[in-house]
């Protein structure tokens, strides 16, 4: 039972860590674009969306190798825990 709780806890932690970086990037880009729009009095609605989309895609592309390593390591841990119990 403790192993199941450990695996669930680790999964929630990984979701928090892995989703944190794109969220931080989108927030920073949104603030910068909003500041730019305020200073220039630009009223374009789709500008922040497009720039945030590009920023998050770039972030996911750059971190994809690390994401793969982390998820593969977690999958191995869960499989080893399951095999040790069974």
UniProtKB/Swiss-Prot annotation:
Keywords: Cell membrane, Membrane, Transmembrane, Transmembrane helix, Virulence
PANTHER family, A to Z: FLAGELLAR BIOSYNTHETIC PROTEIN FLIQ, SURFACE PRESENTATION OF ANTIGENS PROTEIN SPAQ
Family of the protein in this entry: Belongs to the FliQ/MopD/SpaQ family.
Function field: Involved in a secretory pathway responsible for the surface presentation of determinants needed for the entry of Salmonella species into mammalian cells.
Keyword Transmembrane listed: yes
Protein name: Surface presentation of antigens protein SpaQ
Transmembrane segments: 16-36, 53-73
């Amino acid at each position: 039972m403790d192993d199941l709780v450990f695996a669930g806890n680790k999964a929630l932690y990984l979701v928090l860590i892995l989703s944190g970086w794109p969220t931080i990037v989108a927030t920073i880009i949104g603030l910068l674009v909003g500041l730019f729009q305020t200073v220039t009095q630009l009223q374009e609605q789709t500008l922040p969306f497009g720039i945030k989309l590009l920023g998050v895609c770039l972030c996911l592309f750059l971190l994809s190798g690390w994401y793969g390593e982390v998820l593969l390591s977690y999958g191995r841990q869960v499989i080893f825990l399951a095999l040790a119990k069974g």
